[in-house]
Amino acid sequence: MAEEYFGMNVRAESPIRTAHAMLEGLRKKPSTLAFGTISVSGINYLSMVMAMKLGGVEYRKLKTVTFVSGSESTLALLGGHIDAVNTGLGNMAEHLKAGKIRTLAIGSPSRMPEPFSDVPTWRELNINVVASGWRGVMGARGLTPAQVKFWEIALRRVMETPEWKQDLTDNYWVSNTVDAQEARKRWDAEYLESQSLLTDLGITRAK
């Protein structure tokens, strides 16, 4: 139903001005910066790892601090307790407007609207990463095709409501409608990709 893309952020006073500068420093010493995350198995962390990997960084040596929520990691960044955080744009928009943070790159397929319109995508920086925390609805096992169709129609109607469209705007989400079959294909593909990366990081065991 929606895609939530993630941005790499540092404090406004950070000496790191660009994503390229961040990658250059981390290639020399991967443990230089402390990154905040809410889960080392979540897509916000894994998308960051993918960017670092493609940027030539020894990503297994990154310094990571785990928090219980995106807002907590954001506060830690603002307070100077961590150096960077890769998080949803909705967590950072007001801080960017206030001049408190700098967003270096976003993992979206194209540039996002204000206040992020001047922020390059990872792809623009020749780092081929597009990843989102997508929003959808899961049904119970055993739903009949007719029941699945009922919910597909109902949820499409929800997506046409002013309330849903306002949620998209407020959270910097991007609307994306796929049916149950396509959603399952995406789920399976992302599961395999995540499993491979988590195994590479030593977080899970290979099956």
Where are these regions (language model features)?
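A ligand-binding cleft/hinge motif common to bilobed small-molecule-binding domains
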Residues: 45, 49-56, 83-117, 195
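Conserved functional loop/turn residues at catalytic and ligand-binding sites
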Residues: 18, 80-81, 100, 126, ...
